[in-house]
């Protein structure tokens, strides 16, 4: 359905505020694909839904170099052949499970052969296998980036930065930090014993009602994560309230010290082994450093437990503490800037997998004056035809709105192969800054915008996904907003190359605790080269 231009442009502006890069959306069905079709059973039916779903909803055809119609003709008979193999195996009195698994493997290979060609960096595909009924899921970008030599170079989240009285994070330097971790850790430690007791009690019952089954299912899913967190906290002597006393006693009073600059925020929003963190520090010669490993705070879903949600009441405290720290960072940065004491800024998004574009305001948005900054242009799906797009509109990043002038001190952003989505948008915003450069390694390659919220589906008619995650036989999380950035163009499947390439030296870190990429950023700001 066509819409007048002003509605499309308004929607585009709104999308920037509420778009993100989560692949766990389960909200909507795509236009043009019915709920019944999403319960496709055979490989041919699944392939048909996928083909039409992409044909009607994908926005990035101009960056692809293959014929989608030809793909339909080429792969349809191949999936039909797989269907026939499954049906022949199942006709036996005792179907051969190994033979079915072979078909499953062949089907997965075909899926990768088809979809690994797509360049979009967020694309996520899941389908229920016809032969085994197992769910298969993959991201083409994972396959593409797996061949990169530097894909596993990312600095460890638990890394400690070294400091000396005259060097990095040493001397009379001031440390600003937040202890959101204490809020989170205390909640987990307080609630975990009751969760364990509830799990033991429910698991021992002979029969359960619907509510009890839901609680038990939630506990079975989440307890392993919480146990890991508890173990992590017990081993981490620097978390929470110990941070302040440790820094206060160490800075300026020791000739050399290893200082852990981490503010750990355990969360089930990510994989079990991930820790969300915010780091804010200032060197002795007034270089501000900050690092975060996600952009999810605008809709932070803390320790979500489905119907067994006992911790969400602390959401507001986490919001307030986190934003207070970022606002404090902003205020301190501009105070030092106005006083002429700010030497430079290092923003570290290495290993940052992205999140919500609304979070950009509190990160890259602090470098610019005004309400917003124009990074490039974007267009979105606007009809079921393969090439039905809206007219291009400007893509803006929100800024603080209170800055009277741009930061004019050097800004360095550290990136690596695992800097994704919002991290890449942030990198571009720094590169476009007159005094900004990027350093490290080329980023992931996923700068398109995504939306999965029902509010915007009602406006646009598109939801950014096909099917429901872990429910329907087919689920695809795909962008329908194509973004082009000034000076760089479309970065899907390409990423953002650094202005100064520096490969991370893990051997150096393991031997000395030194971070060569961080040191190069410090050197650039101090020496201007």
Functional labels for PLM-detected ranges:
Residues 22-353, 358, 369, 458-465, ...:
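Flexible, low-complexity junctional segments that flank or bridge functional domains
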Residues 17-20:
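C-terminal motif of bacterial Sec signal peptides marking the signal peptidase cleavage site
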Residues 1-8:
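Bacterial N-terminal signal peptides that target proteins for export
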Residues 22-51, 202-206, 226, 282-290, ...:
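C-terminal "post-core" interaction segments
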